[in-house]
Amino acid sequence: MLDPINWEAATDEAVNNLIRLIRVESVNPPGNEEPAVLLVKEILEREGFPGEAITIVEAAPKRANLVARLRGDGSQRPLMLSGHVDVVPVEREHWSRDPFGGEVHNGCVWGRGALDMKGFLAMYLQIFLLAYRRQQPLKRDLILAAIADEEAGFEHGSRFLVDEHRDLINAEYALNEGGAMTIHAAGKRLYPIQVAEKGVCLLRMSASGEPGIGSVPNTDNAVLQLSNALHRLGRARHLSIHSTPKLRKMLESLSSQLGFPLGILLNMMISPAIAGLM
């Protein structure tokens, strides 16, 4: 039987790793994510994680990506924990604290990337370290990915890995950023869940009409029919909203914690009649 996890010690370790990550200035543009990726590698190797299970690939000089793999028994496909190490630029004059200082103040870690998304990466790294230390039997491989170039187009990061090194990151499930930003409301700390981002809906449209020639146009030709349809689609502002079971469960849970009036408003969002008006 596995020993209980000392969550206080694990939290302290994750915070310390986050501070170290923030102090690496991996601003994108220009990128230069290599030092942050090498820091993750150093933390893993210091723990004794085998070097042959860590892969670093560069899409361009200094644009590095790290993928580490903890083996399971292979009965299920892998789970990937993925976080980007690059951050957006800073305007230091607008900061009350050093954006790359990683200071702890009022119970929070301050710095560029604390939320987006070195904080996530530090948590994923901690989970990965705990699973390795405990030698916990896994049904699937656990993949840790520290990725470049999320902030400026993905070309040197996730897109590069998908196009050139898909074997390293091929997984059944992936946890990334989004959703788990802390919400402080009604004196409570709440953690929402985000299942996915907006996607793409590909449509194929066809039309039929009366043929004709340019010198004698008619209002029933196929091109005009398609043009009218595209115009109506472009003007649509209130397309149908489809809430997933996971979203409804999250909103119900949040509403029960928030009480009146915020909880009532969240419950209204679940109502199909109200959601269609929002």
Q: What do these predicted ranges mean?
A:
Residues 56-59, 150, 193-198:
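Short Gly/Pro-enriched turn/cap motifs at secondary-structure boundaries
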Residues 28, 115, 209-215:
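A generic structural motif
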Residues 83-85, 177-179, 207:
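Fold-independent oxyanion-binding glycine-rich loops
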Residues 166-173, 179-188, 193-202, 214-278:
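Acidic-enriched catalytic cores of C-N bond-cleaving enzymes acting on peptides and small amides
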Residues 108-109, 115-192:
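Acidic/histidine-rich catalytic neighborhood of metal-dependent amide-processing enzymes
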Residues 2-112, 133-140:
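Acidic/His- and Gly-rich active-site-bordering loop/insert found
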Residues 19, 38-41, 122-129, 159-162, ...:
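Predominant activation on well-ordered alpha-helical scaffold segments within soluble catalytic domains
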